[in-house]
């Protein structure tokens, strides 16, 4: 009899220590369990539309350069995952180092970059 695969849900924190997203590798979900992006093996974070958003740090946080021209190419997205049920309680955020002036926390300063499939500025018109 096959045993079910246990998926590990990793909270992604913002700079204030709040869990604003969850990682079930390679997918990123918002607090409502909706798919908002994905991570490459090199820790680059992409939106559901395939646009580069930033990088996943060891904290874990999603950060990007303040003056990012985003010269990375748009990537094809992996197959859309099912919605998850986020945990009711998450561990406290680890101590995080301050970001340098040239870096920003995406979940705090640019959360619109990680939107769901049915919303967002970059979505194609019908």
Annotate each language-model stretch with its function.
Residues 1-10, 51, 57-126:
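Long terminal segments
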Residues 1-32:
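N-terminal leader/targeting segments and the first structural element of proteins
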Residues 26-27, 31-36, 41-55, 59:
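Compact, well-ordered interaction domains used in eukaryotic information-processing assemblies
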């Amino acid at each position: 009899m096959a045993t079910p695969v246990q998926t590990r849900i990793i909270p992604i924190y913002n700079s204030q220590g709040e869990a604003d997203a969850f990682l079930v590798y390679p997918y990123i979900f918002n607090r409502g369990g909706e798919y908002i992006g994905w991570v490459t093996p090199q820790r680059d974070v992409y939106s559901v539309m395939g646009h580069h958003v930033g990088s996943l740090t060891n904290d874990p946080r999603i950060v990007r350069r303040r003056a990012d021209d985003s010269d990375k190419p748009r990537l094809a997205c992996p197959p859309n995952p099912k919605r998850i049920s986020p945990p009711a309680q998450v561990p406290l955020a680890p101590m995080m180092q301050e970001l340098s002036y040239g870096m920003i926390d995406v979940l705090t300063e640019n959360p619109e970059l990680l939107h769901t499939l049915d919303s967002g500025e970059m979505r194609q018109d019908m």
